[in-house]
Amino acid sequence: DVTWDKNIGNGKVFGTLGQNDDGLFGKAGFKQQFFNDDRGKFEGQAYGTRVLGPAGGTTNFGGRLDWSDKNANAALDISKQIGGRPNLSASGAGVWDFDKNTRLSAGGSLSTMGRGKPDVGVHAQFQHDF
């Protein structure tokens, strides 16, 4: 594989060319950090891929947003294969301390492929250490 990246302004252009069992592939994109301060850390990325194999080729493109702070995180990823349907994935989770022995953790996720029904997941835990 050949990988490269170059800093441009507040972001980075990246790319990879290589070969695997699916055939030849290339991936390129741009990643940028919007802020990293008391609001947390917020990053975004846009990318595209191309795979050439014995059965033909595929082209995908998408984007991703990630946010996190000391208590929580969230992510959103949207992608689409040319000729296909869009895919969406979103997740978030957090941990909040009430005192030194008590905390609440909770999170959830949503994922959908094309026009199908979305997969939804939620979880929560209340913990107290005696």
Swiss-Prot record:
Signal peptide: none annotated. The keyword NAD does not apply. Hemolymph. One of its GO terms (biological process) is innate immune response. Its main location: secreted. Keywords: Antibiotic, Antimicrobial, Immunity, Innate immunity, Secreted. It is found in: Secreted. GO terms for cellular component: extracellular region. It comes from the Eukaryota. Pfam families: Gloverin (PF10793). The keyword rRNA-binding does not apply. Antibacterial protein active against Gram-negative bacteria. This is Gloverin.
